[in-house]
Amino acid sequence: MKGFSFKDENGKIYYEWWIVLTAAVVTGFVYSGIVSATGAFMLPVTQDLGLSVAAYSLYLTIMSLTSILTLVIVSKHMDRKNIKKLMITAGIIGIISFAGFALAQNLWMFYIFAVPQGFCFAAMTMTPCQLLVSNWFGEKAKGRAISIFLAGMQLIFILELNVLTAVIGRFSWRAGYMMVAVFIVIALLFVIKFVKWSPEDKGIKRIGDPDVAERAAALPAVEQGVEFSMAIRKPVTWFVLISCCLAVVASSAILQHGIPTMVVAGFTPAQATAVTSALSLVAVLIGPFVGWVCDRKLSVGAVCSAFCFALSTVGLSMLSVSKSAVVMYGVFWILGVATVNIVSPLLMSYMYGEKAMPRLLGYVNIFIGIGGAFGAAGLGALYEKFGSYQTPWLIATAALLIVTLVRAYSTAPKRKYDPEKN
């Protein structure tokens, strides 16, 4: 196996790591700019234009639904010939969408420009980046590589969020949206320079592949696996897809309602933001460890991360009783957040190999998009119904316990893809 290292014997950085860096930059600036940084804009935009928070937030649902439709159409075209073209096109469209946001004078402009933003989100960010990293790393290094890529994404997001907060505070929310467009330009430069479909395009062997003595095979590693038509007919595939959706229902709810939950519990907005930033930084350090666990025993990483994520929502529920529950929330969120973006793509590779990964990852991210479209809005509706966050977070806990059971079922040894048997 080509060793898990950053430089070759000549001291040059392996090209695989430029792929990881590119994925981190693209998702850190673009994915996070579209989804994770929305909180920085919400109050400035709604107060300046006199919009309700609910009406303004609807653009996120429009964006998510557009991204789902986009993935249905383009996932089958994410291949060696088209992936770079798709990412560049999506980046240009994303720049246009944020320029439109910066010029918005009414609610409908946000709704209109949310459509091209959804195309950018689907065709440039998580799906193609996960696919590229998956292509460039073999089964013995894939989990660590994805976790390092996501750790880099988180660090870049923290930088982006602080820059946006400063720009919005000093200038305006319009300048903030233009800053996101600038970040997309930076991401595009990385795509143009570094994106290659697989190590075969560079004539090199990828990190993490077994040696010939470990696994003799006639086909290259990136071509081994179950046909998509067979994989999609298996019930376990749909169980996994539903688990991806439920995990993101909870994740998107935490993203939008985690800080408000802490504020309602008695934290100041500044304290709640500081807690969130601190957790994100610690998660950067924990992510590679979770990836290491998944490389060695995916069932342990998948089940434990999902269960910890469930316990984090219990902590959020208990904040209505005691502020000290923030410790429970924080500890288990750090250990559990990997269940969304680290574990989800590994499940399909574990069960079916890599031949159908472009389309399977497309389906994974379609279901992630469905969860993202309705998670935050659903929890907000439950909050209005019950008058507090306690019961809504317990409902999220129940959903994550289902995720835990599905991941235990799908990572059983008998479901692991074996090229000699399959």
Cite the ranges covered by each PLM segment.
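Helix-to-loop junctions at the C-terminal end of transmembrane segments
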Residues: T70-N82, G287-L298, Y383-E384
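Conserved MFS/SLC helix-loop-helix module at the cytosolic interface between two early adjacent transmembrane helices
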Residues: L69-L107
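C-terminal transmembrane helical hairpin of 12-TM major facilitator-type secondary transporters
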Residues: S277-G287, R296-L347
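Extracytoplasmic gate region of multi-pass secondary transporters
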Residues: I34-V45, S229-P288
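Hydrophobic core of transmembrane alpha-helices in multi-pass small-molecule transporters
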Residues: G28, M109-M124, A325-T339
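A late C-terminal transmembrane helix in Major Facilitator Superfamily
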Residues: I148, F157, M351-F386
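Extracytoplasmic
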Residues: W18-V53, L71, L161, I254-I259
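Intracellular juxtamembrane helix-capping segments at the cytosolic ends
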Residues: A123-F137, T339-Y352
